[in-house]
Regions:
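Glycine- and charge-enriched low-complexity intrinsically disordered segments
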Residues: 283-316
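A conserved acidic, glycine/proline-rich C-terminal tail/linker
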Residues: 232-270
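Generic structural signal for buried aliphatic residues
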Residues: 140, 252-253, 275
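Glycine-rich active-site loops that engage anionic ligands at enzyme catalytic sites
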Residues: 177, 197, 220-247
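Active-site microenvironments in enzyme catalytic cores
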Residues: 3-216, 220, 308-316
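Short, charged beta-turn/beta-strand-edge "cap" motif at the junction between a beta-strand
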Residues: 147-149, 257-261, 280-285
Length: 316
């Protein structure tokens, strides 16, 4: 057994000592190249000592290296400061029956997500009592490393920490119903969002060539690539920062890849299904689908009796 803070006294060379690494993700994002280098060296130290049969522990005697099967992964940032989800894939919009307006090519448009309902890998996707059509969305997004305001695209690129998978879970029937008022979404989205399983840092990301796929119970339902987007990561962040402060640890989802949801396929997940979203280099975000919640007596509005089922409009 070897304590990390006692390595020097145990004769570890400089190359064998674990450097200080931020103990939470937003601080790690903000540590930049120095933090990334420290993290890589810490991993190298852990591998070296493991090969020698040393058990690394912290100052309190707790192990610092664990088997994957012995831990439960949370969302990379369980409660980001802010989450925005953009529409940047034309195939998703047209696949859902929308006609693209000039605004789509002029600027990236988003809605703000509920940061209090984010779940991580393996956690259950909540099925609200008020929907009969639960849906997944196959997305990729990025975290900001440092804050900024009025960033140029060139500057914005240096403020991006890395990417992860984002499942923008949707209650499609009520979402379409409420957005018929040209506002929202609200109850159609606010109940649950999944992200993970890890953050792939930008030094390993080619943002235009990430291959993505969605499987339900092991069956391939959808696939696509990030090259189909309208805007780059930096363009999205630059636009968001115009006359507005952006903070470290914010999350920017880039929207659903074309064909990357049940709504476009007219195919619907069911309670007990396992939804797996995969992105090359990032891994697989896997979540079970929960059972439909029972609506408590008197809860909600008596004027709402459920939305009609929705089906995507198909182009001839």
């Amino acid at each position: 057994m070897l304590r990390v803070d006692e390595q020097l006294r145990n004769g570890a060379t400089a190359a064998e000592r674990a450097p200080a690494v931020a103990d939470e993700m937003v601080a790690f994002f903000g540590s930049g190249e120095a933090g990334l280098g420290n993290a890589q060296r810490a991993l190298d130290v852990a591998r070296t000592h493991r090969e020698r049969g040393n058990r690394l522990v912290d100052g309190d005697g707790n192990p610092v290296v664990h088997e994957v099967g012995d831990v439960r992964l949370l969302a990379p940032v369980p409660r980001p400061r802010r989450v925005r989800d953009y529409l940047t894939y034309p195939g998703h919009a047209t696949g859902g029956g929308l006609k693209l307006s000039p605004a789509f090519e002029a600027m990236p448009i988003c809605y703000k997500c509920n940061i209090e309902t984010i779940v991580g890998p393996g956690e259950t996707l909540l099925w609200p009592s008020y929907t009969d059509q639960l849906d997944f969305e196959l997305e990729l997004g990025f975290f900001t490393s440092t804050g900024g305001r009025n960033l140029t695209p060139g500057e914005a690129q240096r403020h991006i920490a890395g990417v992860t998978i984002f499942n923008d879970v949707s209650a499609r029937d009520i979402q379409v119903f409420e957005m018929s008022l040209t506002i929202g979404p609200s109850k159609g989205k606010d109940f649950c969002t999944a992200m993970g399983p890890c953050v792939l840092t930008m030094d390993e990301v080619d943002e235009w060539s990430v291959e993505m796929s969605a499987r339900v119970n092991g069956e391939l339902w959808a696939s696509g690539t990030t090259k189909e987007r309208q805007f780059s990561f930096a363009e999205v962040l630059s636009w968001a920062s115009l006359d507005e402060d952006v903070y470290p640890g914010e999350f920017f989802a880039l929207g659903t890849v074309g064909g990357g949801c049940g709504y476009e396929l007219d195919r619907w997940i069911q309670p007990g299904d396992i939804v797996e979203l995969e992105a090359s280099g990032v891994g697989v975000l896997s979540n079970p689908v929960g059972t439909k919640q029972i609506r408590p007596d008197g809860a909600g509005l008596a004027t709402y009796h459920g939305s009609p089922e929705v089906h995507p409009a198909r182009s001839e």
